Every structure is written in C-alpha cells, then in structure tokens.
Amino acid sequence: MASSEQEILAGLAEIVNEETGLPTDSVQLDKSFTDDLDIDSLSMMTIVTQAEDKFSVTIPDDEVKNLVTVGDAVTYIAGAQA
C-alpha cells in the first residue's frame, strides 16, 4: 500500500532522528540532507537503506545523489511505491 507524502515525511524524520539524533520536526521537505541537516554520505546510505526497508522500495545507488532535499526523497519514494 502506498504511503501519503506526509506519512513518508514522518517516516523519514524518524529514520533521520534515529541515525543523527536530530529532532523529527527539523526534518522538513525543503531541508537539504547535507547543507541543512549536516548528514554525511555514510549516514545518508544508512538512511536510504532504512527507508528502503520501511517503505518497501528500492533506491539505486546512482539515484541517491539526486536526493538533495528531504522533499526529493519523499517524491522519489512516493513514485517508487505507485
């Protein structure tokens, strides 16, 4: 079953919180993973792997570089679930 964008955002916020300790309310659609949330490439790969498991999607390694903002990730996951 496909998740709504709000459900995906909430799920990603939980994953980011678990990985980085950032408050879930700081994970917003317009936030950059690297510039705003200070997530490095290793943490990003962990977040991607957890998101794949949580949302039952596959995010190819070469697609991860295109997930600049939280909104990019939400849009990608929503599209992959459709």
Swiss-Prot record:
Residues 3-81 form the Carrier domain. HAMAP family: Acyl_carrier. Pathway: Lipid metabolism; fatty acid biosynthesis. One of its GO terms (molecular function) is acyl carrier activity. PROSITE patterns: CARRIER. Pfam families: PP-binding. The keyword tRNA processing does not apply. InterPro entries: ACP, ACP-like_sf, PP-bd_ACP. It is found in: Cytoplasm. Carrier of the growing fatty acid chain in fatty acid biosynthesis. GO terms for biological process: lipid A biosynthetic process. 4'-phosphopantetheine is transferred from CoA to a specific serine of apo-ACP by AcpS. This modification is essential for activity because fatty acids are bound in thioester linkage to the sulfhydryl of the prosthetic group. It comes from Beutenbergia cavernae (strain ATCC BAA-8 / DSM 12333 / CCUG 43141 / JCM 11478 / NBRC 16432 / NCIMB 13614 / HKI 0122). Transmembrane segments: none annotated. This is Acyl carrier protein. Keywords: Cytoplasm, Fatty acid biosynthesis, Fatty acid metabolism, Lipid biosynthesis, Lipid metabolism, Phosphopantetheine, Phosphoprotein. Belongs to the acyl carrier protein (ACP) family. The modification O-(pantetheine 4'-phosphoryl)serine is found at residue 41. Its main location: cytoplasm. One of its GO terms (cellular component) is cytosol.
